[in-house]
């Protein structure tokens, strides 16, 4: 739905009270001493469904192409609540203006099979810095969210 820029589909997919955490990698320029590598910082923001979708509309207009590659899927069923699943996956995102590589977590609700919903969407960078992978135990999964 991102690559086809189908905002109507995304509107149906996210629950009205969805927790949406977006991250953006801020790349700084190399130090002038020539010895230091550029540092990467990640800026996180919590968005409501409405503000997230409004921002997507702008991104869709600004970018001719948006490419996504998904891999490393991990699916976990909620231990006590039927129909809830956590999906963690690696996402490589590239567009005309920005690119990143990180992990998405989506909390899916299939209790109404006709209209599945996403209640939680998070993003984390794959790399903590130029040399350090995000430790696997720090990647969000269904255990990070209290669903009571």
Where are these regions (language model features)?
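Short, aromatic-enriched amphipathic alpha-helices that serve as compact interaction elements
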Residues: 1-9, 13
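Loop/turn elements at helix/coil->beta-strand transitions in domains of secreted/extracellular proteins
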Residues: 7-8, 16, 66, 115-116
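Short, solvent-exposed secondary-structure junction/capping segments
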Residues: 12-38
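Surface-exposed, charged secondary-structure patches
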Residues: 33-99
């Amino acid at each position: 739905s991102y690559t086809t820029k189908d905002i109507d589909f995304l509107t149906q997919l996210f629950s009205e009270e969805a927790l949406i955490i977006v991250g953006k990698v801020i790349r700084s320029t190399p130090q002038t001493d020539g010895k230091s590598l550029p540092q990467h910082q990640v800026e996180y923001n919590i968005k409501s469904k409405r503000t997230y979708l409004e921002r997507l509309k702008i991104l869709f207009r600004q970018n001719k192409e948006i490419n996504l590659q998904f891999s490393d899927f991990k699916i976990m069923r909620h231990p006590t609540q039927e129909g809830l699943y956590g999906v963690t996956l690696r996402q490589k995102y590239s567009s005309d203006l920005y690119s990143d590589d990180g992990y998405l977590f989506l909390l899916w609700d299939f209790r109404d099979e006709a209209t599945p919903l996403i209640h939680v969407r998070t993003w984390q960078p794959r790399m903590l810095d130029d040399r350090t992978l995000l430790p696997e135990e720090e990647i969000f999964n269904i255990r990070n969210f209290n669903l009571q």
